Amino acid sequence: MTTESGSDSESKPDQEAEPQEAAGPQGQAGAQPGPEPAGGNGSLNGEKQQPALEQFPEAAAHSTPVKREIGDKDRDFAAAAAKQLEYQQFEDDKLSQRSSSSKLSRSPLKIVKRPKSMQCKVTLLDGSEYGCDVDKRSRGQVLFDKVCEHLNLLEKDYFGLTYRDAENQKNWLDPAKEIKKQIRSGAWHFSFNVKFYPPDPAQLSEDITRYYLCLQLRDDIVSGRLPCSFVTLALLGSYTVQSELGDYDPDECGNDYISEFRFAPNHTKELEDKVIELHKSHRGMTPAEAEMHFLENAKKLSMYGVDLHHAKDSEGVEIMLGVCASGLLIYRDRLRINRFAWPKVLKISYKRNNFYIKIRPGEFEQFESTIGFKLPNHRAAKRLWKVCVEHHTFFRLLLPEAPPKKFLTLGSKFRYSGRTQAQTRRASALIDRPAPYFERSSSKRYTMSRSLDGASVSENHEIYMKDSVSAAEVGTGQYATTKGISQTNLITTVTPEKKAEEERVEEEDRRKKAEEATPVTALRHEGKTDSERTDTAADGETSATESDQEEDAEIKAQDLDKTQDELMKHQTNISELKRTFLETSTETALTNEWEKRLSTSPVRLAARQEDAPMIEPLVPEETKQSSGEKLMDGSEILSLLESARKPTEFIGGVSSTTQSWVQKLETKTEPVEAEVESTPHPQPLSTEKVLQETILVEERHVMSVHASGDASHTARDEVDAAESTPTDRRHTGKGKEGSSVTEAAKEQRGEEVDQSAPEQEQPATVSHEEEQASTIRTSEGLEQKSHFESSTVRVESTSVGSISPGGAKLEISTKEVPVVHTETKTITYESSQVDPGADLEPGVLMSAQTITSETTSTTTTTHITKTVKGGISETRIEKRIVITGDADIDHDQALAQAIKEAKEQHPDMSVTKVVVHKETEITPEDGED
């Protein structure tokens, strides 16, 4: 069977004339087989057409009439022409039936189906719903563009659409993939959410973008995903009210004008009162300004922009993996135990339900280390991997990485298909339109509080971590070797995407390199356990594509991005507001209630390391110490501690769970007042070494009154399991607010200071020196409700000291100071609430760990112990920070600053004890101090 091509059939009408005229009396015979082509293959063509006529009898009967004998020549010619036209119609029908693969030609009566459209419902950030119809075969980008057009949103790269799968897990809608392939069953219901939280919301171009970011953060706070203190809740709530309602008007605003708003998971009348009080102080602030202040405070929260995923480590311990702009965060028992900045991550991959992180080797390492985690199932592993790929691409790369184009590839082809943050910022700078008008909706939608997993409000303290039986073993497994990351490798949330920013960071790093070494040095010494040497074969994997030079510069300058000007600006902005906020709570009952709310507010996971040296945006008790203020005697120290000694009362349903935060305790030390001069000979009043120790011991809630003895024991017994001279602090004037000088205290205290900095004080102790050691102890909840049977204690102690040697750090030789005269004085201030019998019952030591990190100017030693006594689980984190300086340091100022820092970093605790130990060693050369 032969099928003629379309080009041959189309050329036949042009060739019909010549054969038809040349046929003459044989026109009928020539007409029947059809026209001959110019090549003279008429007979062959006729033979081919005859079987075709036999195979289609209906078409042949229709197109070929019965032959009739007509004598007239003209009628024969006309009949032949008519038959030729009918035959051409037959040829067209035959070609359409034989050559076409379309089913429509075979079934001309069948109705063509139009593409099916699907009804979509999108829940917006203000609680309203937006409905639209999209083609069933549309990609996710089509629906997302419709939603953004409805919202009049141009800076849309920070946002995305989410949907719930069959397991009720949140998934991000892939804009490059068809919607029907992502939602296999069920209705097409989506939620519009912020996908990438901008590290600096001030860089957003339009107010409408910041407004939707505020809506997302308010929902995060109400749902418990973004925990913050009671003070922060009140301040953010006041900005929310100012943004939506404007200035406070006593004529229009009644006592309950904000009762319809929802500010916190545990919304209370006390919170409303504080919000109203702060709202009155915002008079004249525009809605856009209020939202900017809201974002400036919210971005400093520890959980800002962190996407949490449940997982288990190699030992089967429940952890949480958080993905944010700066990298990967690892939480265990609400403690951030590790962080992997994007420059340190070499590759992320998954295989089945395992998720792997390959870490770039350090300066003194030869091989990469791979850490594996186990997720609930393979879908959760892939979901986490995709989130990591998108965050890394958006925040770190200048251009998105193209998916692999090979036909056969191993692993997933998924890559982030949107614009990066660098591209978004460039596009935002080109926006040229009037500021869009939009209505700021009310907060009536916040009627029910929910936690991350749908738990009730009383379980909000447990939403991030599940309490584990092995929670006491803080220093086990791979985290014992990698825990130094969280104390030294500080990461700023603003990651540079442009070469200019990178060059600026490198220049700043070179300028400050002489003052402090790279904080990542502790990373270099971390060992690799067997659990880290995991197979990296994965179903999906991606690699960081930055150059090594960029990564090294990024790591070295992580904690140098924030300048002193930014710190002072932040302190001025926040502290002034908090002072007016706190000055209103003058009554004792109100203060106790205030501290009670602080203790029961959602726990901050950490003082944001990425914003170091920024302090927590809100502190309940601000210690006003100017830069030149001094503590000349004990009365001023007592005044600092007076407001923090009130007992707190815990109300809630939280079981005993460790709530110590290593990274919060290890945020920063005082800036070095002066560099150490490398002078081998002592100069009077020219060289001085300052030892500032910050011992932070903290636990969270206390049980009942009968357990206050254990709590008081914790408050009194400062000495950790790693310390060798515990008797000094126990016997220096306990219960007295005066001074007691004992020779044993002098000698033991001197030895203790020496042990706190083993690599620095050997030459310093022999030389002439002045020691000032102070211990600030803060304890929370020494008086509790008797109906609690089990809880934990949070205790904080800070120690500040100074050593003034007659030479440089380690260059001093002992032959320069043959004789040392020592004068010692010890002053102890202690709260009368401490139980005198607290230290009689020993605790059972569950775990102990010591972490030491050192730079050119700072040595940090952290002792972490966990004990259980009397049904109370107590975690003690004692930190000593030794700062070396070369100037005439004001020791009283250093003490005041340490107290201030301790209260700023831990606002939910009260100071109960201060020990000032001053030891002056006089050499014959220097004379008496």
UniProtKB/Swiss-Prot annotation:
Query: The FERM domain covers which part of the protein?
Result: 118-399
Specify the protein's topology with respect to the membrane.
Answer: Peripheral membrane protein
Residues modified as Phosphothreonine: 495, 518, 545, 725, 923
Major subcellular site? cytoplasm
Q: Which domain of life is it from?
A: Eukaryota
Q: Which SUPFAM superfamilies match?
A: PH domain-like, Second domain of FERM, Ubiquitin-like
Q: Name one GO cellular component term.
A: paranode region of axon
State the compartments where it is located: Cytoplasm, Cytoskeleton; Cell membrane; Cytoplasm; Cell junction
Q: Which residues lie within the region annotated C-terminal (CTD)?
A: 777-929
As for what it does, the entry says: Tumor suppressor that inhibits cell proliferation and promotes apoptosis. Modulates the activity of protein arginine N-methyltransferases, including PRMT3 and PRMT5.
Query: What is this protein identified as?
Result: Band 4.1-like protein 3
Q: Which organism is it from?
A: Mus musculus (Mouse)
Q: What is the lineage of its organism?
A: Eukaryota, Metazoa, Chordata, Craniata, Vertebrata
